[in-house]
Design a protein with these regions (language model features):
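Bacterial Sec-dependent N-terminal signal peptides
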Residues: 1-47, 514
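Outer-membrane beta-barrel porins/channels
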Residues: 42-56, 61-62, 130-514
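Outer-membrane beta-barrel translocator/receptor signature
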Residues: 59, 71-80, 86-165, 240
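Short amphipathic alpha-helices and their capping/turn segments at secondary-structure boundaries
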Residues: 83-84, 250
Length: 514
């Protein structure tokens, strides 16, 4: 009961490095594995999200659905196939400011809630230098490029609002304790599975234990009637790729290229679950409580890209590229908090005694792309790409202690699958200087048939451009549609919430040739 003395709740915080590592490893296990099977673990972050990429960058690349493996000739296309640098004929500098807005429509226990988030960013910026080699046999030119492409946006917010939810998050905590035969002595921050959630609920009297009855089990303070729940997630950050690329043009038939890429991840994820107790429930003095979780992940990675474009005829182009896995060194920091409000008492507030801090290595999957393009003289072109991504190749390893993450990697093998992404694009030249563009892309579902979730999405895009010998201006609009299914906690206790996401991205590229 809330009126009993608080002294028996005060658990000594042990702040040693071994405790910190154990807590963090267990946390990453939950995050990177259990979230894959759509159960709500500590948060939404998982290795899959950090490894995926989208069609972003320059306005021309976005407008044509990213179908540039066989085309080249655009700055952001270098990130798709580095051989595309060999197609460029002159030096150029370009920058792409962009506006991104995402709207979510979430349904939970029959109630729909709309949420949104937006931001301005730089989709790409870089410079290309081309050297004429007409005097060196059939090698026409060599090229070098340096710049940045934004390859993934983590910006997103969504809200679940549930009325008359039959179970509580605290019920999930209670079941965990009972099923594992645990007592109050186990609710210590040093006990890895519970230090950032159940421990806080215990400190705030949301879980209790009759200390004078040794045959009793844990009970919770949420009462017996259905409750109202609100769950809000706010994510932000991006994945940016800085690269140095080299390429060449052989006899205007064969274009080759390679690049060294350095990827930077900055990701934040904040969520809060709030539960309001039914005022008619006379079995408890609890009015409401909330559980909040905050985390950041940041770090750097590196990899190599190789590519080739072959032009068997003046109209037909074939392309292929290969991307090695990106090896990231990442740091994760996180903390949690719990607030409980009982009738007649000041609010109880408990913050996680430790701030999670752990360094680990993440290896993203390899990628291979194949493209086909047909150029209709000066009238326009059509292009298509097929991209293979092996998500079962995701690997993890602890940096500070060498922890292998083998159980988590086994789960990745069990729940993820390789995917094929399809991209299509077209360009029609209205006049000598003006072009209209359109694109469509299908990104496959990385979850296999054993997982009740859909991780694929579709992209639709339009654009136009003006180009002359000195400068160019391109604009694009991209629409992305996706969906998600998520359990806030134990799927045996609660229904899944579903979200439909609509992303709107507007990009403008300004370029100067010299």
């Amino acid at each position: 009961m809330v009126v009993q003395e608080e002294v028996h709740r005060q658990t000594e915080v042990e702040g040693g490095n071994n405790i910190r590592m154990t807590l963090t490893r267990f946390y990453i296990s939950l995050v990177l594995v259990f979230s894959i099977i759509t159960s709500k673990a500590q948060n939404e972050l998982d290795a899959l999200n950090l490894s995926r990429e989208e069609v972003t960058g320059s306005a021309r690349t976005v407008a044509m659905g990213g179908a540039f493996t066989a085309l080249g000739g655009d700055f952001s296309a270098i990130a798709i196939n580095p051989a595309g640098i060999g197609v460029l004929r002159s030096n150029e500098f370009s920058i792409t400011p962009a506006y991104h807005s995402i709207i979510s429509n979430s349904t939970y226990y029959g109630t729909s809630t709309i949420d949104s988030k937006s931001n301005f960013n730089i989709g790409s910026i870089g410079i290309v230098g081309v050297k004429d080699l007409n005097k060196v046999g059939k090698w026409r030119s060599s090229s070098v490029a340096f710049g940045m492409n934004r390859t993934q946006s983590f910006h997103k917010s969504y809200t679940f609002t549930g009325k008359d939810v039959p179970n509580s998050l605290i019920d999930s905590y209670q079941n965990t304790l009972i099923q594992n035969g645990l007592g109050p002595e186990d609710l210590d921050v040093s006990n890895a599975p519970y230090g950032f959630d159940i421990f806080l609920a215990w400190q705030n009297f949301l879980l209790d234990y009759p200390i004078f009855d040794t045959d009793s089990v844990f009970y919770n303070a949420t009462g017996v009637l259905p409750i109202d729940q609100t769950y809000r997630v706010v994510k932000s950050g991006s994945k940016r790729q800085t690269f140095l690329a080299f390429g060449g043009n052989y006899d205007d038939k064969l274009y080759v290229g390679g690049s060294i890429r350095f990827s930077r991840i900055n990701y934040t994820n904040n969520y809060i679950i709030n539960e309001n107790i039914n005022p008619s429930d006379t079995t408890t003095a609890l009015n409401e409580y909330s559980f909040g979780f905050n985390e950041t992940i940041s770090g750097l990675g590196a990899g190599l890209d190789l590519g080739v474009i072959y032009r068997p005829t003046n109209q037909l182009r074939l392309g292929a590229s290969f991307k090695t896995p990106t090896v990231y060194s990442l740091n994760i920091e996180y903390e949690s908090e719990n607030t409980a409000i009982f009738e007649g008492f000041d609010p109880f507030y408990t913050q996680s005694p430790l701030i999670g801090d752990y360094d680990f290595r993440l290896t993203s999957p390899l990628q291979a792309s194949f493209g086909l393009a047909y150029v209709f003289g000066k009238f326009g072109l059509l292009s298509a790409d097929m991209e293979y991504v092996n998500y079962t190749g995701i690997r993890m390893q602890g940096i500070s202690d060498g922890y292998s993450f083998s159980p988590e990697e086994d789960a990745i093998q069990s729940f993820l699958t390789p995917t094929v992404n399809l991209k299509f694009g077209g360009e029609y030249r209205v006049s000598q200087f003006v072009s209209l563009r359109a694109g469509y892309a299908i990104f496959g579902n990385p979850y296999n048939s054993t997982v009740d979730n859909f991780g694929g999405f579709n992209l639709y895009s339009l654009g136009l451009g003006y180009r002359n010998e000195e400068y160019f201006i391109d604009a694009s609009y991209q629409l992305k549609t996706s969906e998600n299914k998520e359990y806030l906690y134990d799927p045996n206790l609660v229904e899944a919430g579903t979200s439909d996401f609509t992303d709107h991205r507007i990009s403008i590229t300004l370029g100067y040739r010299f």
